[in-house]
């Protein structure tokens, strides 16, 4: 016998799916939208209770969408299937924000870079290095994660960075990485990596425009600091 509470076990006028059909998705709360996707609760919690507690326990949607599958499955009521559903939803959300309707994204200021990558990077538990490849009009043509782990100049090799830019016919690049501590203050290694990549870019003919360090809702631009 299946003891899991399902959406259909709720009164019809309280079912998120029915409310979505009748009133539109925009009127549903975050918990209701998550409930529509997860569909079933547990033997002790209906799906609305589970969705609400999941968002609360992880600290909100931003934090929920940056959990790993291991972290999600440690939460009571979340098995592998539900964890995978959440991760898939998270990735779709990030891709939509990054590639919104296929619109071109032009970089004019460091804030433009921050707006592009902040949601994806601000709560990461490990350091991640992204490369943004730009054309001659400073429009982002490609974004890729090139490294995950503690950054230092002996590990981050210019070859890996500029190889992507050459493949994609990039005119220039911007690199971004996060500090899991939430403090984006550049370390000595951050500065060394930046200067090394700047020099390599000059030799290759692909300019490093900036190195943005992401913290918790704040960032530091190496260009604004005068490092490059």
UniProtKB/Swiss-Prot annotation:
An annotated GO BP: proteolysis
Keywords: Hydrolase, Metal-binding, Metalloprotease, Protease, Zinc
Entry annotated with the keyword Phosphoprotein: no
Coiled coil regions, renumbered to chain: none
MPN domain mapped to chain residues: 106-228
Molecular function, one GO term: metallopeptidase activity
Residues holding Zn(2+): 177, 179, 190
Motif (JAMM motif): 177-190
InterPro entries (UniProt xref): MPN, RadC_JAB, RuvA_2-like, UPF0758, UPF0758_CS, UPF0758_N
Family according to the record: Belongs to the UPF0758 family.
Protein name: UPF0758 protein CBO3003/CLC_2900
